Structure formats: C-alpha cells, structure tokens
Amino acid sequence: LIERLKEPNKNCWSPIGGKLEMRLGESPFECAIRETREEIGLEISEGDLHLFSMISEKAYEGSCHWLMFLFDCKKRIDSLPRNISEGSFAFFEYGEIMSGRIKIPETDRTLLWNIWEKHRDGMVVLRADCGNILTSKIEQVI
C-alpha cells in the first residue's frame, strides 16, 4: 500500500492507482499497467491482471462521482518500491489492514477490502453512495 501525501485520501494507506488518460482513449487495463509502472516500477501486462470489480461511487468526498476498476495483480514483488512524490510504501497483511491499526479510507475498509476478500477470484459490480451515510448495492456477481 502507499501512504498518500496528496488528495484524495491524504495521509491514508491505499492501493496504488490513478485516473484514466481519457484524452488518449486509455482503457482500464492500460491505465492499471501504466500506473503500476509509474508508481512501483513494475512492468506488467494484461495477462498479469484480473479485473475483479467495477464500482460506481456517488458523492465521493461529498462532491465527485467516480467509476473505479479494481484489479488483482498476479505478478508479485519481493521488496518495497522506492518512495515517490505521492507517498511511501509498506506491505500489510489483510488482517492488519482490517484491524483499524493503520489509517485507511473508510470506504476502503467498508467496501474495497471486503470486495477483494470475497470476490478477487470472480467479478462483482457495485454501486456506492458516499453521501452522509455510506450505502452500497451489489448489482451483479459473476
């Protein structure tokens, strides 16, 4: 995980990721490959990735609407990546992430990591409303 130095999720531990280069017509897979290379220096291909979730998030941080594509990367790393301008890295076990001992975004604790734990070998489509009270609805499980 990366301890983010910038918004969104500043000062929280989060999976690596980023935004699609929409003006270039970048696909979610191309974005995941690029962000992995940029953030941790790992060269991967589409075959290293498994898309396990698509989440539509309404009112994230009270204002914006996000469409997230969550991937599990089958290619593993042995050592921590070098620190980057966006933050520093650490390895954590799933139980440690969910324990509350490390600071992660509430939406990650409530949704993202539970989805990873239950559906990382399949596919789930989910809609979340991050308004005053976080609500979510699974729309499809494959």
Show where each model-derived region lies.
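Active-site-adjacent beta-strand/loop module that shapes the phosphate/pyrophosphate-binding cleft
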Residues: 57-80, 109, 113-119
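Conserved hydrophobic/aromatic beta-strand scaffold that supports enzyme active sites
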Residues: 1, 68-72, 91
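Hydrophobic alpha-helical positions that pack around
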Residues: 16, 32, 36
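N-terminal phosphate-binding loop and adjacent alpha-helix
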Residues: 21-31
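Hydrophobic pocket-lining residues within nucleotide cofactor-binding pockets
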Residues: 20, 44, 55, 75-76, ...
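Charged phosphate-binding loop/patch that engages nucleotide di/tri-phosphates or the phosphate backbone
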Residues: 115-142
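NUDIX/MutT-family hydrolases
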Residues: 81-115, 136-141
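N-terminal strand-loop-strand
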Residues: 1-15, 44, 50
